Amino acid sequence: MAEGAASREAPAPLDVAGGEDDPRAGADAASGDAPPPALGGRMRDRRSGVALPGAAGVPADSEAGLLEAARATPRRSSIIKDPSNQKCGGRKKTVSFSSMPSEKKISSAHDCISFMQAGCELKKVRPNSRIYNRFFTLDTDLQALRWEPSKKDLEKAKLDISAIKEIRLGKNTETFRNNGLADQICEDCAFSILHGENYESLDLVANSADVANIWVSGLRYLVSRSKQPLDFIEGNQNTPRFMWLKTVFEAADVDGNGIMLEDTSVELIKQLNPTLKESKIRLKFKEIQKSKEKLTTRVTEEEFCEAFCELCTRPEVYFLLVQISKNKEYLDANDLMLFLEAEQGVTHITEDMCLDIIRRYELSEDGRQKGFLAIDGFTQYLLSPECDIFDPEQKKVAQDMTQPLSHYYINASHNTYLIEDQFRGPADINGYVRALKMGCRSIELDVSDGPDNEPILCNRNNMAMHLSFRSVLEVINKFAFVASEYPLILCLGNHCSLPQQKVMAQQMKKVFGEKLYTEAPLSSESYLPSPEKLKNMIIVKGKKLPSESDLLEGEVTDEDEEAEMSRRMSGDYNGEQKHIWLCRELSDLVSICKSVQHRDFELSMKTQNYWEMCSFSETEASRIANEYPEDFVNYNKKFLSRVYPSAMRIDSSNLNPQDFWNCGCQIVAMNFQTPGPMMDLHTGWFLQNGGCGYVLRPSIMRDEVSYFSANTKGIVPGVSPLVLHIKIISGQNFPKPKGACAKGDVIDPYVCVEIHGIPADCCEQRTKTVQQNSDNPIFDETFEFQVNLPELTMVRFVILDDDYIGDEFIGQYTIPFECLQPGYRHVPLRSFVGDIMEHVTLFVHIAITNRSGGGKPQKRSLSVRMGKKVREYTMLRNIGLKTIDDIFKIAVHPLREAIDMRENMQNAIVSVKELCGLPPIASLKQCLLTLSSRLITSDSTPSVSLVMKDCFPYLEPLGAIPDVQKRMLAAYDLMIQESRVLIEMADTVQEKIVQCQKAGMEFHEELHNLGAKEGLKGRKLNKAIESFAWNITVLKGQGDLLKNAKNEAVENIKQIQLACLSCGLSKGPGGGSEAKGKRSLEAIEEKESSEENGKL
């Protein structure tokens, strides 16, 4: 290799237009917009196959000739590529059987090598921000990488494979991180080749993520097998996958002729991969046979294997498998364990657990016996429920259910009795069945006088279709606790006369019996009972007569939502509240959900009882949320509030529930009969916590003293922002939009990722469109979202057709942020009406990282950021009351210490990741693997030794080491040191913060009086109260963040130590380090069972 081949090429001036050395800079040069070339530079129609000799006198392309040829040909275990099909040039015009897209998929290392030998254009990035177009090829002898044009002679414009130390995917070198054009370069199209003793980098950008993956996979394969004979690439036919397919074919070939009917072959492939369409399999066989200039209804073994591999190999999964298997074409138990720990975030995984996964998902008997997982089994595993994006812990009740009812969001239905629009839609009892089965915990009963003294439920715009009140009660009683055992709230809309009200009360008592919760609320309490205490109880929400009155009936205000809106629209509304008569029997069924009218927050906080609740129309709630967001949140800490859709929504469309959840409103009633984006949000939100219909609100909305505004457009005090990294990799089996008018099944899909939450978090990103591909469109695009309040955030994936006529919707999936699982996950897509679509998925990678401070996610390297940015600290506010301000001033220094310790540890970890060439989303396990690969010499002995100092794992060199390794060790030592400082100091600093918080809280009750004594009133007093709540929120939040950071640091140290042991960095002179490391691990842990120690 020429000295400095990758870093000393003289660039052409930037203003040169064209020519051999034309540097192309900017987004157009590197963003990946250009379509990828056909793989390996092959012709679009090229296919490979077995050349069979024909029998005498029988045409070889006839079925008889094919059968004779197969009998005359010895059974082959290899697929021989037909050289005639490799020729470039024109073909006769003929009918095309090519499937879309027609480029051959990558399904093996051989395909990658062939592509690299054919060559393609890559963009070469220099540290001086210049970008050059170069044509890169791999030598036919597989020994060197070459590029042209170049001002150097041919022998210098090359890179020997033997000099390559490492291949990195993504923008993970200093050239990319600090390059002024880095933001315009697609992350998934970039890769770097590190070579030479000093780890110089050759930084490249492909025109698509697919092409980048081919080069990375191919180069890694070559580097890992550089000592093997040159003909090792030709052994594809001997891979476990081909041997398994051969066995499958032979088992189905009952005649032993090496040929099967096409119908049998199609059925066999469908058995192996049920997601494939029959038409697609038949088209693939025709395509393969057409490339051999024969059409027949019989399939050879080779054609069967080729068809299966091309149809069932997902390139993105193949590239992943090669990456994590250390360039093999299968995973063993150790590979799988590393994948689960480092990528999927699985803890406490063992080799036996990995072998069990292999036994359950590997398709070949040989693989199950030998303990390896090939591409097809790995694909099935990734598609299994074990790799679902939804956290399995949230599929059961996982939250504290002992808090007051007002501390939960409650799954609520509006106009439950309707299954169509509210203008003319008939009443249907199935509305209640569906809602209750979906976990709804608040349903509406709009009751009117019926014939024969029997109350009824009906749409008052369509009285002909009605339900008897009793039949509805019986259905509710039957399904009330099928989906959830937690309390069900019946929102009673009473439009009945006094006689029929008595019938209502009698029927409810008779049907529900002891399930009815009628206990009088205790005046000694301040909050509602908990869902846990109210299990299997039915609570009636409605009007109530004064308890001190002995009257058997009386007047109460009417809360007929639809009637009031009609009066407003007709101009009959004069501001006066309508009244109705209420009987004592029905009144006595109302206990802890007494309906009252809302006037203003100040009056409510003084006079409203905790068992009283208000209902707000959508219009009124929106006005309050905009004008008094903080007051609305504070009100909802103690009292239940219900928001219902505007009566103007005659089509039963839905409001956006997120707008009111942001204000803390617990019961946001939805029209379950109307699907769409708003109902998707509602359904997705209540999937968490076991789908029980109750979701605990964020602590900042529950704490008695806290500051939170529903309209915040910045960071939330006391909450550390997180960064969500989502890579949209591919889609599987996308259907045509149901309402589309276009002919054919061709679609042009793209993906939108929506973030829903507080205003500061709401945003949307979309991928590029993939043309004419519904089966396995590859997107390979990564997005970053800063999330300021994770507990109130949802992620919605939407797949749309860019070339639609009539309808663009393909599918969607909505999931709470807290339920996301990290790693490679399949998203099960739902239809427009919310049903799971079989075999229709989106393949993604999820990672969540910490983000210090506010603003957009940073894209520059840590060294650049540290040099340009002064650290920002969360500030406490001045209240204007000296006694209290003096207490909060004591907390300023501990707060700075807490923030410094957390950020210093995070920065040290990021620095190690950068030096290892890994992105911020990488795990520490991945860092240690990369680190060990550089610190272990060619004879498998480490150049460093693991040394435990006071229970912390340090690495000490065993002799002279290169500067590159010195820098990595220095970064590693700093990470350990900063973690140690945090672990040892966190408790002391947190205690100081907690003491300041407690001292401040002692003034909470007297804050109004103290303010009045100091002359604060009106706006100034409100500002002082707001600042007080801000400071308490900051102190509590920072204390919690510090505690969590310490726990994270302790866990990191354990993982680092285990990784050092498993990577072989403990093998120092004289041995013994490994045992010492294991003993030290026990000292770090606070509590650990003997069983867990045994596993370690």
Swiss-Prot record:
Residues 399-543 form the PI-PLC X-box domain. Residues 702-831 form the C2 domain. It is found in: Cytoplasm. Residues 83-222 are annotated as: Interaction with PPP1C. InterPro entries: C2_dom, C2_domain_sf, EF-hand-dom_pair, PH-like_dom_sf, PH_domain, PI-PLC_fam, PLC-like_Pdiesterase_TIM-brl, PLC_EF-hand-like. Residues 1075-1096 have a biased composition (Basic and acidic residues). Phosphorylated by the catalytic subunit of PKA. Phosphorylation of Thr-94 resulted in dissociation of PPP1C from PRIP1. One of its GO terms (cellular component) is cytoplasm. Keywords: Coiled coil, Cytoplasm, Phosphoprotein, Transducer. Residues 586-702 form the PI-PLC Y-box domain. Involved in an inositol phospholipid-based intracellular signaling cascade. Shows no PLC activity to phosphatidylinositol 4,5-bisphosphate and phosphatidylinositol. Component in the phospho-dependent endocytosis process of GABA A receptor. Acts as an inhibitor of PPP1C. Involved in the assembly and/or the trafficking of gamma-2 subunit-containing GABA A receptors. This is Inactive phospholipase C-like protein 1. The gene is Plcl1.
